[in-house]
C-alpha cells in the first residue's frame, strides 16, 4: 500500500508538470482523478459487515489506550518534518547552486525512493521487527543533521533529502501493522482515523513549525531549523526505545 501511494504521487506529480506547461492553474486538474476513484470505490468495494454485529452485547464504552495518542503525536511530528524538508529543500538548493537551479527533478525522485523503501519494509520488518521503527527514526535524525550542516554542500543536502524518504515508508507501515497490539477490535478503526488526522495536522502546521524552529535557533540560516528537528527525533528515539523495552520486561 505504501509503495503504491508513492507510485501514485510520482505519476500525479509528472502529470501536474505536464499540465503546468499549458497554464499554472491547469496543474490542479490532477485532483479531478479523485472523482473516478471515488466512483470505483462506491461501485466495487463491498460493505464490511461484522459477523458478530447481530449478537447482543453489553455496550461498555472502551477507553482509548494512551499509546494511540502518542502515535498520533509521532505522526504529526513525522509528517511536519517531512513537509518542512520538501518545502525548504528548493530554497537551500537555490542558495547553493544559484537561482537558475531546478530542484523539481530531485523532488520527483522522492516518491520513487519511497516506493523502493516500501518494498523493502516487509523483509526488513521480518528480519529485525521493532528495529525497523528504530532504524527509520535514526535515518530521519541523520537526514535532519545532514541538511542542517549542508550550508554550501549539495552532497549533504541531497543525501539528507533522499534519506528522509525512507522514514515514512518504514515507520507508518510498522505502526499500522502493529496497531492491533495497542488497541482492541472495537477501537482500532477510530485509532487509525486519529493517526491519519495527525498526519493532516502535521501537514498543516509544517510552515508554523518551521518558523518556530527558526526562531529558537536565533539564526537566519535556512538550514538552522533542522538542528531542532533532529533534536526532537533524538528524544523520540530514546523514548520509543525505553518504552518498548520496559513493556517487554514486564
Spans of model-derived segments:
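A membrane-interface helix-boundary motif in multi-pass transporters
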Residues: 18-32, 212-233
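A late C-terminal transmembrane helix in Major Facilitator Superfamily
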Residues: 180-219
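C-terminal membrane-cytosol helix-exit motif in multi-pass small-molecule transporters
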Residues: 32-51, 239-243
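Extracytoplasmic gate region of multi-pass secondary transporters
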Residues: 67-108, 114
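C-terminal transmembrane helical hairpin of 12-TM major facilitator-type secondary transporters
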Residues: 130-175
Amino acid at each position: 500500500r505504501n509503495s503504491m501511494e508513492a507510485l501514485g504521487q510520482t505519476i500525479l506529480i509528472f502529470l501536474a508538470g505536464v499540465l503546468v506547461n499549458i497554464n499554472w492553474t491547469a496543474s490542479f486538474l490532477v485532483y479531478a482523478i479523485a472523482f473516478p476513484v471515488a466512483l470505483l470505490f462506491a461501485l466495487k468495494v463491498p460493505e464490511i459487515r461484522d459477523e458478530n454485529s447481530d449478537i447482543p452485547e453489553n455496550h461498555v464504552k472502551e477507553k482509548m489506550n494512551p499509546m494511540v495518542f502518542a502515535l498520533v503525536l509521532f505522526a504529526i511530528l513525522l509528517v511536519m518534518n517531512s513537509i518542512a524538508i520538501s518545502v525548504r529543500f528548493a530554497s537551500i538548493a537555490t542558495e547553493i547552486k544559484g537561482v537558475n537551479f531546478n530542484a523539481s527533478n530531485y523532488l520527483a525522485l522522492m516518491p520513487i525512493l519511497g516506493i523502493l523503501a516500501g518494498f523493502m519494509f516487509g523483509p526488513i520488518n521480518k528480519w529485525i521487527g521493532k528495529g525497523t521503527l528504530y532504524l527509520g527514526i535514526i535515518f530521519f535524525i541523520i537526514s535532519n543533521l545532514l541538511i542542517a550542516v549542508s550550508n554550501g554542500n549539495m552532497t549533504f543536502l541531497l543525501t539528507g533529502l533522499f534519506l528522509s524518504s525512507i522514514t515514512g515508508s518504514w515507520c507508518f507501515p510498522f505502526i499500522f501493522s502493529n496497531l492491533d497490539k495497542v488497541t482492541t477490535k472495537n477501537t482500532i478503526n477510530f485509532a487509525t482515523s486519529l493517526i491519519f488526522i495527525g498526519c493532516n495536522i502535521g501537514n498543516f502546521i509544517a510552515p508554523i513549525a518551521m518558523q518556530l524552529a527558526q526562531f529558537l535557533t536565533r539564526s537566519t540560516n535556512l538550514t538552522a531549523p533542522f538542528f531542532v528537528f533532529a533534536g526532537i527525533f533524538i528524544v523520540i528515539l530514546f523514548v520509543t526505545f525505553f518504552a518498548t523495552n520496559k513493556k517487554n520486561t514486564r
